[in-house]
Amino acid sequence: NGGANAKASTDGSAVGYRVGQQRLVNETPKRDLDTEKVSYVAQSSNPFSLHSVVPADQAVYTKKALERIGDVDQFLVDELGYNDKDDMYKALASEQADSVALAIHQAKQGKAFIIGDMTGIGKGRQAAAMIRFAYKQGNIPVFITAKKDLFSDIYRDLKSIGNSELRPFIWAADDKVHSADMTDKDGNIVFKRTSDKEQKRVMEYLVKNGKLPEEYDYIVTTYDSFNSGTIEYENGNKKARKDGKGSKNGQLKRDVLEHIALNANVIMDESHKAGGQGGGSAYLQYVVPKLNAVTFLSATYAKRPDNMPIYALRTSMNQAGMESSELIDAIKRGGATLQEIMSQALASSGQFIRRERDMTGVTIDWKAIDDPEVVAEQREQYDSIIGLFNDIINFQRTYVSAYVDRRNEELAEVQSSIGIMRGTEALGIKNQPFASKTYNMVQQVLLSLKAREAAKSGIEHLKNGEKIVIALNNTNESQTGQFGIGEEIDAPDLGVSLKKGLEGTLRYTSKNAKDESESGYIN
């Protein structure tokens, strides 16, 4: 097959390909009206395929978008600077080659591209390829992600596509718990976090020269770098905060990205984190139109309606001519049906792709807990905890709401109002179910009830010489993130969550006549 034997890496990316594993080169499979997904047929001729599937209503549009590029493999050899197609095949699986080609094609036209692949298709390697593209073009690659520990992941992906030599400017605050150092797969530090003093020097250099110093090749940072500043952003405009508050250091970071925007190719990993109504999101929506190129990556890119405006800035969505608020309202009204239509339209424009692993033939064995004693014990525990939920809800309704109403009457004369912060009223019950505290707490309760039986099952498999993987719906990082690696802690219980929920009922937000908001806790 003309290439070295290899296998897929753990992130779903390809390192060469297996002997005899051939991609099926055929037309997009025909489907019945009730078919949700069809096999993905790659435009790339790389024999190594991840054997993915694609939403049936996007398959034809994706194929036509790729056909407009033509020879995807030669296109990537030219744009990414590989020696030949076989060299490129060792870096990118056929699915990855297709999406990277589409992303580059859009970047060259000044448009954005959204990679919405699910876990197992290798979004990290695709992001690395876009860093390589920006570097080859002489632009500044800027990789923005959700967490610092993902810096190491992008380094490993860069190494996998042949670019381990690229030197990162690691633009992040010092954090003893969550290190920003880049490590290899064995945990060895390859690149240390750039020191605070050096970060300041490089930022000043970027503002003055519009490019990176010679000792750096690309930038890595996180979304929270842009969360706070002394300037407010809205509808493409900016103005200084009236109260003069805000982070000067955060504003400097914002100014730096704006200064280099014309030369910057920004890769937004976990791009749903870039959307929303916060200050950092407003800034990113301000700067995205100024960037040389932008690529978004997220399996849940359209997680909420307020995620969408940032994508509209550089895709065909902007042809609707709607303000951000209008777009959000339209998506709220249109729901899943409208989002599906929008995804089709983006795929037709060559600006969106979504694949996932084929789960055909995978069986799921549902284990029911049927021991009468265990069931009785769990029922008693559940009823007890739900009783505490109701106590907290009643406490807020009886005492906190009454206090807020009384304060509103007192403040009415000075045209100021006070209201319960979103997410705390009735312990979150009046919020969207998936964002409410009660939903998350019930999930924790159910996990706690099942954990012991799951552990027993896992121990039995271990005794049989089998390796196990235990998958959790939620890692509860918000409660465990403050603990250091290897630190001994007391066995956690639901009391921690219940206490946080109770404290949350005392949170309030106040707004004065100038429409300025402050938050705090009722004493």
What positions do the PLM features span?
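Conserved Walker B
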Residues: 118-119, 270-272, 299
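Walker A/P-loop
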Residues: 110-130
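SF2 helicase/translocase NTPase motor core
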Residues: 60-91, 124, 135-282, 290, ...
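N-terminal accessory segments
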Residues: 5-92, 392-401, 411-418
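Conserved P-loop NTPase motor "coupling/switch" region that bridges the ATPase
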Residues: 265, 281-364
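N-terminal pre-P-loop "Q-motif" helix
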Residues: 89-111, 446, 450
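Short hydrophobic/aromatic beta-strand immediately N-terminal to the Walker A/P-loop
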Residues: 112-118, 142, 469-471
